Amino acid sequence: MGRTLENKKEIVADLKETLGESTLALVIEYQGLTVAEISDLRRRLRPSGTVCKVTKNTLMGIAIQDDEKWQPLSELLKGSSAFLLVKEDFSSAIKAYQDFQKVTKKTELRGGVMEGRLLKEPDVKALGDLPSKEQLMGQIAGAINALATKIAVGINEVPGGLARALQAVADKENGGDDSAA
């Protein structure tokens, strides 16, 4: 028994809502994966806030039809498609997919769309090589901390340097008095 029209409308509405929250959509060929393997992929993607949707290409086509941001996705809608809808941390999501692909070797990345731009496989791999959000925040925090430390050391050096200079002048004057006497 096929899906009812009402059911299809619900699926399209759900896809539109998920796409609205997403920054990146990846399309993979998933033919040959078992239910357990798809569940494993979803489990791996969950920590990065990524949703894996397996739906008909026509329903995804209807969902993106009125949204220019996702229009390029229509070029990737063919065959058995699974959609990885990434909300924020696309680097972690791509790495999670690549790890899954290394284990199963059953999927093929067709491409993706980010900010209205069609991404081919090399583009997606380049995005995956970027540091994750947490790593970037750590690097920024480290740089800020290092800057604050340098400022504190610099501020402490000014009075210390001044005190040493005054002491040197005082020693010179005292030493000069001793030799004159």
Swiss-Prot record:
Gene Ontology terms, MF aspect: large ribosomal subunit rRNA binding; structural constituent of ribosome
InterPro entries, A to Z: Ribosomal_uL10 (IPR001790), Ribosomal_uL10-like_sf (IPR043141), Ribosomal_uL10_bac (IPR022973), Ribosomal_uL10_bac_type (IPR047865), Ribosomal_uL10_CS_bac (IPR002363)
Keywords: Ribonucleoprotein, Ribosomal protein, RNA-binding, rRNA-binding
Record carries keyword RNA-binding: yes
Any single Gene Ontology cellular-component annotation: large ribosomal subunit
Annotated SUPFAM superfamilies: Ribosomal protein L10-like
Spans through the membrane: none
Gene Ontology terms: biological process: translation
Domain of life: Bacteria
Keyword Lyase (UniProt): no
Biological role: Forms part of the ribosomal stalk, playing a central role in the interaction of the ribosome with GTP-bound translation factors.
Protein family: Belongs to the universal ribosomal protein uL10 family.
Subunit (UniProt): Part of the ribosomal stalk of the 50S ribosomal subunit. The N-terminus interacts with L11 and the large rRNA to form the base of the stalk. The C-terminus forms an elongated spine to which L12 dimers bind in a sequential fashion forming a multimeric L10(L12)X complex.
Annotated protein name in UniProt: Large ribosomal subunit protein uL10
Source organism: Trichormus variabilis (strain ATCC 29413 / PCC 7937) (Anabaena variabilis)
Name of encoding gene: rplJ
